[in-house]
């Protein structure tokens, strides 16, 4: 399931609720997944933790996203696989490399 784009109930940062939205699976465990939030609200300034995927990106069609979106690697969550509502697409190798580069640069732990 890693590198798949799924629909999940992604929690709000204050844990007051959640919203069904697309997310990128960045790790799959036995019962849980770690996902990165995907938003169609493109910020005026892209952060170092963001990956913008525009409709003209060569890998856009495979993602299953409907409009240009941003993957927010500063908004990740570990969620039960039971919260996944469905799979809408996947990340092809070139786009996966872009994701890995951003995660490596951003987390530098």
Give names to the regions the model predicted.
Residues 11-15:
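Short, charged beta-turn/beta-strand-edge "cap" motif at the junction between a beta-strand
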Residues 16-19, 25-56:
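Compact nucleic-acid interaction/catalytic patches
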Residues 58-109:
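C-terminal terminal-subdomain/extension
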């Amino acid at each position: 399931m890693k590198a798949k784009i799924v629909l999940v109930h992604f929690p709000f940062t204050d844990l007051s609720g959640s919203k069904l939205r697309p997310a990128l699976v960045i790790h799959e465990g036995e019962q849980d997944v770690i996902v990165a939030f995907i938003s169609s609200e493109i910020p005026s300034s892209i952060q170092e933790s963001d990956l913008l995927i525009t409709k003209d990106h060569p890998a856009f069609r495979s993602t299953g996203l409907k409009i240009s979106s941003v993957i927010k690697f500063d908004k990740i969550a570990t969620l039960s696989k039971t919260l996944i509502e469905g799979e809408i697409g996947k990340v092809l190798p070139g786009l996966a490399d872009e994701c890995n580069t951003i995660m490596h640069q951003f987390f530098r732990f």
